[in-house]
Amino acid sequence: PTQNYTRYSLRGSFDQGVGKYFRFGLVNNTNYNVTKGSNIGLYGVLAMSPIANPYNADGTLKRTVKYNSQDESFVLTRGVVEELEDSWLSKTEGFGTYNNLFAEVKCPWVEGLKYRVNLGLNYRSTKGGSFTGEGINSTTADTPSTASLNHSETTNWTVENLLTYDRTFGKHQLNVVGMYSAEQTVYTRSDVAGRDIPAEYFQFYNIGRAEGTITVNPDNWNYQKSGLMSWMGRVMYTYDNRYMLMATVRADASSRLAKGHQWHTYP
């Protein structure tokens, strides 16, 4: 009952010509979403014995149900989950914007020759937190409260330059393309957790006030930066729309590869 997902999206584009030789445009896709209650699982309810009695003699709900000397589980009902809405919760916010821009110009002095640049700018951010109050979802009433907070961010840019020559001479058609592109991606992630939060209204917003252990696990912190660079050339000749010859060469370099072995060429 306390789980929900909300998403807002915005998309727009335009393609505008200026005179006979210049054209530019943009495509944008932006979204924002919120996910709540993902830490509240139903497995405990599904796994509970159908003959278990979750009620006390006076009709009130028990805190836990014990099947035998070893098996005991926290009682979960819709009412319990709703009552604990501010004491047992999680929230994840995601924002992303993806943008592609281009500009194209034709050479007025050379028929069939044009230059185009494509630019991609992307950003993605995710921020999430969870909080479980004292004794909640635990067979022990004094189990310390816990909270965690994490954040990740990804930025990416791509630039692609294309020079194209495309002409038809009678039955002969010639298409020549040269391309240079580069891109870079940066990813960061951070995470912190705490035990024994002094006040439930702190939830996961003030983990620094935790009276118990504050955990900063280095395995949950990350920074990555990578890049890719490419060159490409292609020549294609067609005769009478029946016969075609094509030659292509491409070279890529990746920062993820070892120095001295970053460039690879593909004929």
Annotate each PLM feature.
Residues 2, 255-260:
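Solvent-exposed loop/turn segments connecting transmembrane beta-strands
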Residues 134-135, 263-265:
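Glycine-rich, phosphate-binding/catalytic loops in enzymes
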